[in-house]
Structure formats: structure tokens, C-alpha cells
Curated annotation (Swiss-Prot):
Annotated PROSITE patterns: RRM
Region (Disordered): 173-508
Pfam families: RRM_1 (PF00076)
RRM domain location: 66-142
Summary of subunit composition and partner proteins: Homodimer. Binds SFRS1, SFRS2, SFRS3 and SFRS6. Interacts with the spliceosome. Interacts with SREK1IP1.
Keywords: Isopeptide bond, mRNA processing, mRNA splicing, Nucleus, Phosphoprotein, Spliceosome, Ubl conjugation
Entry keyword Nucleus: yes
The protein's role, per its UniProt record: Participates in the regulation of alternative splicing by modulating the activity of other splice facors. Inhibits the splicing activity of SFRS1, SFRS2 and SFRS6. Augments the splicing activity of SFRS3.
GO molecular function annotations of the record: RNA binding
Organism the protein comes from: Homo sapiens
Extent of Polar residues compositional bias: 489-508
Chief site of localization: nucleus
Name this polypeptide is given: Splicing regulatory glutamine/lysine-rich protein 1
Phosphothreonine modified-residue sites: T363
């Protein structure tokens, strides 16, 4: 049986051993009911299984269905081996796991069967006495936590480590055996004790034996030296000399072999130390590399963060610049609007001044007023004469038609006014068109247009003055014959009245 760690109790299925190895008989543990051992009982399938939790791994559902909870166990007497042997009678057991605190009087366990059909049989043991307590058996809601299975990579690493250890041991053994094999050929007859020492592979035993052999060798050499002295005193024979030389050779070979063993062991130990140091250095280098990599990653992250910050700052600066440009544009637009307003005001002032000048130029001269007064006086005379003519006989119509055909100054004045209005409208339209073109054109063209406007205004003023002067001359010329006609009419009227009287008399 495999030994169990205290408090753990994860137990695989061992080779079947007799129950006497546990020291507890099944009769003392508890009586198994006959119904549980009978596989043909229909009532066993009717035991309902509890519903599983929602967060259960679907790969472990089969394991949970095959596990059983066993409670009310005596923590001092019951072991996993006893539970395994007890539940083997029901079916094939895969794992047994002891759980709970060992210091408490009661513990519980989980038993996983190989087949799900053995679970209802195990549930039939509920209430059976196990030792001095009745068992509490029920379905399990959890699967047994098993040790992680070895991956092929981990297994390969373990094999490599084991093979390295085996090779080191083989090299150590071969180094220890090689000098002993050479000595055994020289020593024939089993005189050397190093051969027996080489068979013992433990370092402690070999070390102790070496100490003993050294002490024995010293005592023997001391005794031999004494015996040699005695022999020299007694007799010096060639046979004794040969034995002494052989012994010397043997002692030298033994010491030489021991020195070689020590040297080989020391070399092996030094090699192992060097290897361990190299491994430690490699580990330290790997750690330093990892640290450098982490530092490099951190530096890269810091650089990226700084770049992002710089980009954000540049974006903010660009936004501020755009805002400033927009403000400057708005200011320029406002300035342009103010300039346009001032220009419009100047234009309106110029137009008003032009109109005032035109009105002043349109006012008739004194000669025109005098002619008007003469006309009004002539009209009054006509009215008086017409009144008198109503009393007197009517005059001929031919003379009146002649007088009406002469152009009157009122009609001429109206035509002049219409022409002036048309000219004003044309000039205003031109000014509006020029104002629109002035807005589109640049500031350089504004000065040129102002000069053109001034020149056109002067020309218009001169043009307006010329027709006014011509109109006044025409009025004066027309007034002079009118006065002559009036004079003629005065004389003619008298004649007409006489003729009218003659015609009336004839009619009567």
C-alpha cells in the first residue's frame, strides 16, 4: 500500500492486498446489507441524482456523477486505505480523497468509482456502521481534485535530469573502479583490501574504511620496520630483501591508488561545483535579461506615452492657432465691413451733394422770372379782353390757333425735368454697379474708381449746366416774340372786333 500524507488522502487504486494488512476486519467495520451486493435490484436505479450547479465544467460532469460523499468518519481511526477496501466490495474504486480537519473528531471523504452503476449500490450503505459510527453516504456535488498530469515536455525534462544523474554516478563509479582493477592484477590472491572497499558504494563507508586502512597500514609499517631491524640484526638474506621490496611496492601502490581516488573525487566535486556555479550564473543572467526586457518594455511604454502626450499638445497648439486665425479673420472681416460702411456713407454723402448741386443748377435765372411775370400780366390782359369779347362779337379762330401753336415754357420745363430725372436714375444705377464691383475688387482699384467717379460727376455737372443755360436762352428768345405777338394781338383785336360787328349785322 502506498503511504498517505497527513490531511491529504488522495489515493489511487493499489494492487489488491488481503484485508488483514489493514488490521481491521470487515466484520468489525460494519455489516454490508445483502441488497447492496445484489446487482439486480430495481430500487437502486430509482434514487434521484441532485441537480448540478450552473457553473460546473461539462468535462467534469461524468466524474461528479461517479463520486460519492462519505461523512461521519472518525478522524482518529479511519484511513483512506480502510475506505478503499470497504468500497471495493461495491465496485471498482478509482480515487479516495480524505477531507476535513484532522484535529476535529469527525471527518468526511470522497470516493470516485470507475462505473456510474456502482454509485447507487454505494448509496445503499447509508447508515451502515463503519467502526463505531454510522456512515452518511450521498451524491457528491464536486469532483475529486486530482494531481496534474505530466505533460510530455515535463516528462522529457525529468528524464533528462535522471539520465544526467545516472551518467554522473556511472562516471564516478568507473573512476573509482579503474585504479582498483589495475591493483587487483598486481596483488593476486586477494591480498589487497581495496577490492573489497570498491564494492562498498556509499561514500561514508568508504571514507571510514580508508581511515581504518590508513591506521592499519601505519601500524603494520611500524611493525614491519621493527621486524626488519630484528632481521637485519639476525641475518641478512636475499629472500628477506625480496619480501621487503615487495611490501614497499605494495604500500607505494596502495598510497598511490588512494591518492588517485582522492584526486578523482576532488576533480568530480570541483566539476560539479563549477557546473553549479555556471548554472547559477546562467540563472542570474536570465534574470538580468528578463529585467532588462522589462525595463526596455517600460521604456518603450514611457516613450509611447510621451509621444501621445506630445501629439495631444501639438493638436492643442494647432487648435489654438486655428482659433487665433479665425479671430484674425473675424477682425479683418469686421474691419472690411466698417470700411465698406464708411465708403457707403461717403457715397451717400456724395450723392446728396450731387442732388443738391443739381437742384441749385435747376433753379431758373432772373430773366426767366421776369418772362414769367410778363406772361402772367399778358394772361390777365387776355382774360380781361375775353370778358370784353363775350360782350362784343366773337373773333376769328385762326389767330387763336396761331397763338396756341407757339410752344409754351411750361411744356419745355416738364421735358427738361423728365430728362434730368432719367439722368439721375442712370447715374444712381451706375453708382450701385460700381459699389458692387468695388466690394469685389481690391483696395488698389478703389482709388482709381474714386477718381473715375469724380471725373464723371464733374462731367455730369457740366452737362447739366449746359442744357439749363440753353433752356434759359430759349425761354428768353421765346419771350421776346411773345411780347411782339401780344402787341400784334392787341392791335388785331381791335380790328377783329370791328369785323365781328360787320358780320353780326349782316346775319341780322
Amino acid at each position: 500500500m502506498t503511504s498517505l500524507m497527513p490531511g491529504a488522502g488522495l489515493l489511487p487504486i493499489p494492487t489488491p492486498n488481503p484485508l488483514t494488512t489493514l488490521g481491521v476486519s470487515l466484520s468489525s467495520l460494519g455489516a454490508i446489507p445483502a441488497a447492496a451486493l445484489d446487482p439486480n435490484i430495481a430500487t437502486l436505479g430509482e434514487i434521484p441524482q441532485p441537480p448540478l450547479m450552473g457553473n460546473v465544467d461539462p468535462s467534469k460532469i461524468d466524474e461528479i456523477r461517479r463520486t460519492v460523499y462519505v461523512g461521519n468518519l472518525n478522524s482518529q481511526t479511519t484511513t483512506a486505505d480502510q475506505l478503499l477496501e470497504f468500497f471495493k466490495q461495491v465496485g471498482e474504486v478509482k480515487f479516495v480523497r480524505m477531507a476535513g480537519d484532522e484535529t476535529q473528531p469527525t471527518r468526511f471523504a470522497f470516493v470516485e468509482f470507475a462505473d456510474q452503476n456502482s454509485v447507487p449500490r454505494a448509496l445503499a450503505f447509508n447508515g451502515v456502521m463503519f467502526g463505531d459510527r454510522p456512515l452518511k453516504i450521498n451524491h457528491s456535488n464536486n469532483a475529486i481534485v486530482k494531481p496534474p498530469e505530466m505533460t510530455p515536455q515535463a516528462a522529457a525534462k525529468e528524464l533528462e535530469e535522471v539520465m544526467k544523474r545516472v551518467r554522473e554516478a556511472q562516471s564516478f563509479i568507473s573512476a573509482a573502479i579503474e585504479p582498483e582493477s589495475g591493483k587487483s592484477n598486481e596483488r593476486k590472491g586477494g591480498r589487497s583490501r581495496s577490492h573489497t572497499r570498491s564494492k562498498s558504494r556509499s561514500s561514508s563507508k568508504s571514507h571510514s574504511r580508508r581511515k581504518r586502512s590508513q591506521s592499519k597500514h601505519r601500524s603494520r609499517s611500524h611493525n614491519r620496520s621493527r621486524s626488519r631491524q630484528k632481521d637485519r640484526r639476525r641475518s641478512k638474506s636475499p629472500h628477506k630483501k625480496r619480501s621487503k621490496s615487495r611490501e614497499r611496492r605494495k604500500s607505494r601502490s596502495r598510497s598511490h591508488s588512494r591518492d588517485k581516488r582522492k584526486d578523482t573525487r576532488e576533480k568530480i566535486k570541483e566539476k560539479e561545483r563549477v557546473k553549479e556555479k555556471d548554472r547559477e550564473k546562467e540563472r542570474e543572467r536570465e534574470k538580468e535579461r528578463e529585467k532588462e526586457k522589462e525595463r526596455g518594455k517600460n521604456k518603450d511604454r514611457d516613450k509611447e506615452r510621451e509621444k501621445d502626450r506630445e501629439k495631444d499638445k501639438e493638436k492643442d497648439r494647432e487648435r489654438e492657432r486655428e482659433k487665433e486665425h479665425e479671430k484674425d479673420r473675424d477682425k479683418e472681416k469686421e474691419k472690411e465691413q466698417d470700411k465698406e460702411k464708411e465708403r457707403e456713407k461717403d457715397r451717400s454723402k456724395e450723392i446728396d451733394e450731387k442732388r443738391k448741386k443739381d437742384k441749385k443748377s435747376r433753379t431758373p435765372p432772373r430773366s426767366y422770372n421776369a418772362s414769367r411775370r410778363s406772361r402772367s400780366s399778358s394772361r390777365e390782359r387776355r382774360r380781361r379782353r375775353s370778358r370784353s369779347s363775350s360782350r362784343s362779337p366773337r373773333t376769328s379762330k385762326t389767330i387763336k390757333r396761331k397763338s396756341s401753336r407757339s410752344p409754351s415754357p411750361r411744356s419745355r420745363n416738364k421735358k427738361d425735368k423728365k430728362r434730368e430725372k432719367e439722368r439721375d436714375h442712370i447715374s444712381e444705377r451706375r453708382e450701385r454697379e460700381r459699389s458692387t464691383s468695388m466690394r469685389k475688387s481690391s483696395n488698389d482699384r478703389d482709388g482709381k474708381e474714386k477718381l473715375e467717379k469724380n471725373s464723371t460727376s464733374l462731367k455730369e455737372k457740366e452737362h447739366n449746366k449746359e442744357p439749363d443755360s440753353s433752356v434759359s436762352k430759349e425761354v428768353d428768345d421765346k419771350d421776346a416774340p411773345r411780347t411782339e405777338e401780344n402787341k400784334i394781338q392787341h392791335n388785331g383785336n381791335c380790328q377783329l372786333n370791328e369785323e365781328n360787328l360787320s358780320t353780326k349785322t349782316e346775319a341780322v
